[in-house]
């Protein structure tokens, strides 16, 4: 694959200056251009945005802003931008004329293009079949703390342009679904994290369930539906339709979320690349050092199993540990130290 076969779609808000949050949008574009010098770059943002001529884009797509929805979570005041992300990504992908595309946000950049090497290796293992390549961070493990099946990270996607267009062809989230849990209780047994949701589904689930459902996979009927059929098909979907890479394997740098990589909680909560490798089956055909990988998989599976067990049996402490209204830093530090030994 040549870099000229790829178009990078940067979607989202864009400002020509460095913001108070230290977002440097123009820098992100220029650094990514150095990594993939032959690729085209599309900016998909909102009408009225000031885009300098020398910002480094080949194409700029300006769309009407569909506006926000009610905050995604009951204890949050940040707007739910599901439909904004959907509209800007779809418009950007519509402008792509190359066989392959990358979707990423305007507030991140690439420091290398290792994802191309991983994708090529997997394509060979699959006999030429294509997959959707996505980031592990915030691809949630439905067996851990936030049991949200089909919560596939939307930070970074790579694959055939038509595959990305299909994934991002989901119907918009309507206002009723955005306020689903304002009017009804959460399902019995919902964890402290699941009970925070106002929307019927997380944004990532809203997208992924429509894509997976159209391909015959059993999808959740509720936010944390972990029925046997859903979990079975979720694992099958991740194993056969997706490739998960960790950000450092992709080459993805997301300054806003730099803390995630150091978080033991997120390391357990997410489906990391090694978890995805485990879904490929015990033989690990085509993978280098399969014996070493199997050992790492066993160690991680044990650690996640013990962590999930500890989480379930500490339910009475969850309010103290995880309620943002309470100061529980000493308790969290103690639990974190214990978790390192699991």
Predicted regions and their residues:
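Short aromatic/hydrophobic "clamp" motif used to bind/position activated sugar donors
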Residues: 101
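A conserved hydrophobic helix/loop-capping motif in glycosyltransferases and polysaccharide synthases
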Residues: 6-19
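Catalytic core and acceptor-binding pocket of nucleotide-sugar-dependent glycosyltransferases
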Residues: 110-117, 122-282
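Short, well-formed alpha-helical segments that are part of the catalytic scaffolds
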Residues: 17-35
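Membrane-proximal basic amphipathic "stem/tether" segments
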Residues: 263-342
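Active-site-proximal specificity loops/subdomain of glycosyltransferases
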Residues: 44-95
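Active-site acidic Asp-centered loop
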Residues: 104-105
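Short loop->beta transition adjacent to catalytic acidic/histidine clusters or analogous donor-positioning motifs
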Residues: 4-6, 33-43, 58-59
């Amino acid at each position: 694959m040549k870099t000229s076969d790829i178009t990078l779609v940067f979607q989202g808000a864009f400002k020509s200056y460095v913001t108070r949050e230290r977002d440097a949008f123009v820098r992100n574009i220029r650094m990514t251009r150095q990594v993939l010098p032959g690729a085209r770059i599309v900016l998909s943002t909102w009408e009225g945005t000031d885009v300098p001529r020398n910002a480094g884009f080949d194409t700029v797509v300006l769309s009407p802003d569909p506006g926000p929805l009610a905050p995604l979570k009951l204890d949050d005041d940040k707007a739910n931008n599901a439909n904004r992300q959907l509209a800007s990504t779809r418009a950007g992908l519509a402008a792509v004329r190359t066989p392959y595309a990358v979707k990423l946000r305007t507030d991140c950049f690439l420091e290398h293009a290792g994802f191309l090497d991983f994708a090529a290796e997997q394509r060979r293992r699959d006999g030429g079949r294509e997959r959707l390549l996505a980031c592990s961070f915030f691809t949630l493990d439905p067996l851990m703390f936030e049991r949200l099946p089909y919560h596939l990270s939307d930070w970074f996607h790579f694959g055939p342009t038509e595959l990305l267009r299909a994934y991002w062809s989901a119907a918009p989230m309507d206002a009723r679904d955005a306020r689903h849990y304002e009017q009804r209780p959460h399902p019995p047994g919902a964890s402290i994290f699941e009970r925070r949701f106002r929307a019927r589904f997380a944004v990532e689930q809203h997208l992924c369930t429509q894509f997976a459902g159209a391909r015959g996979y059993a999808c959740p009927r509720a936010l944390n539906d972990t029925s046997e059929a859903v979990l079975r098909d979720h694992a099958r979907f991740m194993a056969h339709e997706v490739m998960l890479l960790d950000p450092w394997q992709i080459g993805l740098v997301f300054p806003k979320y730099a803390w995630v990589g150091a978080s033991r909680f997120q390391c357990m909560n997410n489906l990391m690349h090694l978890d995805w490798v485990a879904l490929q089956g015990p033989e690990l055909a085509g993978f280098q050092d399969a014996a070493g990988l199997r050992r790492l998989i066993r160690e991680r599976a044990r650690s996640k199993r013990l962590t999930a067990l500890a989480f379930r049996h500490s339910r009475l402490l969850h309010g103290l540990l995880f309620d943002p209204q309470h100061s529980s830093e000493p308790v969290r530090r103690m639990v974190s130290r214990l978790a390192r030994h699991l």
